[in-house]
Each structure stands twice: as structure tokens, then as C-alpha cells.
A protein has these predicted regions:
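Hydrophobic beta-strand positions in blades of beta-propellers and related beta-sheet-rich domains
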Residues: 29, 49-51, 118, 177
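Feature responds to low-complexity, polar/acidic, surface-exposed segments characteristic
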Residues: 65-87, 100-148, 154-175, 181-213, ...
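Interaction-mediating elements
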Residues: 93, 118, 152, 177, ...
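Intrinsically disordered, low-complexity repeat and linker tracts
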Residues: 1-15, 23-24, 34-36, 44-102, ...
């Protein structure tokens, strides 16, 4: 490439995508969604990525900086021998400070992840603001997840069990995690169009909740969510902290 190239496209959902590629290999992708959400993803020639997302009023929802080289985590976890398949991913997400340990050099990889914890992880990934007010009655001020839940609800990444109840201490299921990941992907400008047929390869794909089919299918199609063996998806199973790390790494 000897000169700057610009391409534009309109997705099926009406989003307008503009991609500017410079001769040095750096790239800027701007996505303007019909609801007014605008994302800009800048990738430098060295592979560092900055993602900025604003809402229809111009308020910044995401200002994420992801280095090409992931730093080593400050803590060397000593309890990852039960989940060797997740060790690399856990160290990556810990290096990015998305997920913390549970104390005394432990990560607790097979412990379940709660809804409040996942909202907090996605908030850290977004590097979004911390001054939103939570509208949920069961999200008290000053809890570790308070800011994360408030941001995630504002950004449309999470929804409550009802309009007033979020259930932050409830464990999250594989299908709930997939839906939240797909919503986050849409927020930052990725094309989240999915084909429900992606679930047909699993013997229990039809056990996926109707509300979750699109999100789960998108995660399956993009290799973020994989089966569990014997061609099962197990969509309603609890998600462990190790599984969350692996899905974030694939994302």
C-alpha cells in the first residue's frame, strides 16, 4: 500500500462502516450505528489498539487501550494446575488487569463467576467511566461491582433479571455470558449478525433460551464459545472463572 485507502460499507442492520488504511499499515475503523452509537477502533502499525465509543449524545462509554504485547500479571497464580487448558488465557487477562486473583496467589479457576463480577470485568475491559448511578434496587453503593453494573447497564451490555433487580451475586450461565459478550462486541462496532443454524451442530443446541440464541450463535460462529465434548453446548451450565478468561482471550 503506497497511499491511504478509504472504504465504506453499510451493514444489514444499517450501520455505516468506514475503514481508513495508511501506508504504514495502521488502520482506523469507524462504525456509526442507527441508534447513534459511534465507535472508532485505531490499530497502530505495531498492533496496539485503542477503541473509543460514544453514545448518541456524544458521551464516552468506552476508552479502551489494548497493547500488542500483553504485560505479565503481577501475581503468579499457584492454583492453575487443575485447569492447564486455561493457564495462558488467565495470565493474559490478569496481565491486562481485567480479572483479579482471589488472594494468596490464588485465581480459583473452577469457582463460578457471578453476574456482578462479569459486569465488572467488561467495565475494566472498556476502561469506561465510573460515575454512573445504578438503577437496580439490589446493587448497593460501595460494592466491588457497583460501578461495573452501572456502566454495563448504561452501555446496554447487561440487563436486569427484571427492571429493578440485577441479581449481582447470581452465578452466570454460558448462554448469559455469550449474550453479554455479543452485546459488548456490538457496542465496540463488531458485526454481530449471527446464524442460529450454528447451534444445530450441538445435540443440545435447542436448549438455548430463545432470548439468547443470537448471542450464543455469534459466539459459536466466532470461536469464542465452544462445545464441551460429546457435541454438547450445555448453555445453561454455570461458567467458571477459567472459562471466562478463555472466552475473553478468544474475543
Amino acid at each position: 500500500l503506497t497511499s491511504t485507502s478509504t472504504t465504506t460499507e453499510t451493514r444489514e442492520d444499517g450501520s455505516k462502516v468506514t475503514t481508513i488504511t495508511k501506508p504504514d499499515g495502521s488502520k482506523t475503523v469507524t462504525v456509526e450505528q442507527p441508534d447513534g452509537i459511534k465507535s472508532e477502533t485505531v490499530t497502530t502499525k505495531d498492533g496496539d489498539v485503542t477503541i473509543t465509543v460514544t453514545d448518541k449524545n456524544g458521551e464516552e462509554l468506552v476508552k479502551a487501550e489494548i497493547p500488542a504485547t500483553i504485560p505479565e500479571p503481577e501475581t503468579k497464580f499457584e492454583d492453575l494446575d487443575t485447569t492447564p487448558w486455561a493457564e495462558e488465557a488467565i495470565n493474559k487477562v490478569a496481565g491486562l488487569e481485567l480479572v483479579n486473583g482471589t488472594g494468596e496467589n490464588k485465581y480459583s479457576p473452577i469457582a463460578p463467576m457471578t453476574r456482578g463480577s462479569l459486569a465488572t470485568v467488561l467495565h475494566r475491559l472498556s476502561q469506561g467511566k465510573t460515575d454512573y448511578e445504578s438503577t437496580f434496587k439490589d446493587v448497593a453503593q460501595g460494592r466491588y461491582y457497583t460501578e461495573g453494573v452501572a456502566w454495563a447497564a448504561k452501555a446496554g451490555v447487561v440487563k436486569g433479571i427484571t427492571d429493578e433487580i440485577f441479581a449481582p451475586e447470581q452465578t452466570i450461565t454460558r448462554e448469559q455470558l455469550a449474550v453479554m459478550m455479543a452485546r459488548y462486541a456490538k457496542l465496540v462496532g463488531l458485526n454481530t449478525k449471527a446464524d442460529a443454524k450454528a447451534l444445530d451442530r450441538f445435540t443440545d443446541g435447542d436448549a438455548t433460551g430463545t432470548w439468547a440464541v443470537d448471542g450464543v450463535a455469534w459466539c459459536v460462529q466466532n470461536g469464542i464459545l465452544k462445545g464441551k465434548g460429546n457435541d454438547t453446548l450445555d448453555p445453561t451450565a454455570e461458567v467458571t472463572r477459567a472459562e471466562v478468561a478463555v472466552m475473553l482471550d478468544r474475543f
